[in-house]
Amino acid sequence: MFTRLLKHKTNVWIPGFCLFFILSPVAADPFEAGLRAMERKHYATAMRAWRGLAKEGVPQALNNIGHLYEQGYGVAQDYSEAMNWYKQAASKGLAEAEHNVGMLYNQGFGVAKNDQEAVKW
C-alpha cells in the first residue's frame, strides 16, 4: 500500500517539478515578457513589464519605453517623452538609444531640428 501511494505521489510530483523549472525562466524575465507582449500588440503589458526594469535603470527597457512613446503604441504619441526615455538609455551607453536620440534631432521630432546635435549622438 505504501509503495503504491509513494509511486502515485512521485508520478504527480516529478512532472509538476519539471514544469516549474521549464516555465520559471519565462516568468522570471520581464524583459522577454515585454518583447512577447509587443509581438502580440499588447502594448500596455509591454509597458508594465519594462517600467519595473526602467526603474532599475536597465538601458534596453528605457529605450523600449521610448519606442512605445515615439510610435504611439499603447500611449499617446509623444516625441518629447520618447526623447526623455531615449536619453536616459543613451546616458547608460546603449548605442541604439544614442542612434534614436540622433534621429529625433535629425527629424526635429520632440525637439528643434538640429543637425549638429544629430551628428553628435
What are these regions (language model features)?
Residues 113-121:
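Short, intrinsically disordered, charge-balanced linker/junction segments flanking boundaries
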Residues 24-28:
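Sec/Tat signal peptide C-region and signal peptidase I cleavage site
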Residues 1-8:
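N-terminal secretory signal peptides that target proteins for export/translocation
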Residues 13-22:
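Bacterial N-terminal signal peptides
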Residues 30-37, 49-53, 62-71, 98-107:
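Hydrophobic face of amphipathic alpha-helices that form TPR/SEL1-like repeat modules
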Residues 42, 55-58, 71-73, 78, ...:
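Short helix-capping/linker turns of helical repeat alpha-solenoids
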